[in-house]
Amino acid sequence: MTFKRIDLSQYIVTSLCFTCNNSCTICMLSGVKQKMSGIDLDYFRRVIEEIRDSGRFENLILSGAEVTTFDDLDHYVQAAASLGCFKKIQIQTNGRRLRDKEYLRHLIDQGINEFFISIHGLGAVHDAITRVQGSFRETMAGLKNLEAFDVNVISNTVLTKTNCHEAAQPIRILSQEKISEIHIWNYFPMEREDTKDFVVSMKEFGRLLPELSGFARSAGKALVLKSFPECLSVGEPVFFDSLFPVTVLPDRFWREFSECGFGRCFYREKGECQNRECWGLSSAYLHKYGDEKDLLRPITPSQPSPLEGEGKGGG
């Protein structure tokens, strides 16, 4: 079976705003978004014209903190669509405003043809993560509205200790929706220690994988795992994918990101693992659970990445 996946190497992300109608406990921007400002339309036009002229990317992602809280979003979408160079224009969104079907229709009419929607659990679990009561209901209403349109929909769930105990159930439900692929992201702690107690151990994650894989296989959909150690791969329909699209964000964010110690690996640091794309473990993970050298394994030319048979680049 061929599993449909997008190729993120062909996407570039532009962040338009840093406002949000959720207050997620897991937000990577929570410590910096109040200090960052969005981009005006003239500057955005220059950015997307440079992207077009580079010829490097064929798809555009519009993001924010929550891009649908940006009142002028439709004008930015229209500007991007008018260039005629982007096959896909995606928004990354919590999906709550998409419950307004006319608002959704207007965005699609302006040029949005792909939606990346975050759903972090069922009911109260999702609402506890977003810290907005009723947000799960609104997001699912938005997801339901998308069924009426010829657009690509991808779901995203960030795995934390808050939702891992019931992670299988939302994945089961999402696998039955009009969604082309299901993403699960490993939680990125924007700190060197897990002070919030969100980081899930790879052993616990490994226990979840067979059930998650079963739901995806039954639905004929790809289950894409982002920023997990690639040596844990179990084969299709599960795809361990370390690739993230090029992302345009203020330097302040990248400075803080670089201080958090991502990409740690016992075997890579010893020179035994040759995989340079894998996200490995974070400093916060190492502090909490250790280096997992008995669980992980080096990927070398003689011991190739299990991803080679998975079509890692997508398509």
For the regions a protein language model found, what residue spans apply to each?
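Glycine-biased, low-complexity coil/linker segments
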Residues: 308-313
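Glycine-enriched alpha-helix->loop->beta-strand junction motifs that scaffold or abut catalytic
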Residues: 109-114, 177-181
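Conserved alpha-helical substructure of the radical SAM core
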Residues: 1-92, 98-113
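Radical SAM enzyme [4Fe-4S]-AdoMet core and its adjacent flexible, acidic
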Residues: 44, 132-144, 148-265
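Hydrophobic faces of well-ordered beta-strands that scaffold small-molecule active sites
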Residues: 10-14, 60-62, 89-91, 115-117, ...
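Flexible, acidic/Gly-rich N-terminal and inter-domain linker regions that tether
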Residues: 1-13, 22-26, 208-231, 288, ...
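Conserved radical SAM core fold
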Residues: 21, 67-69, 95-98, 115-132, ...
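Flexible mid-to-C-terminal extensions adjoining Fe-S/redox cofactors in radical SAM and related proteins
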Residues: 2, 237-238, 242-304, 315
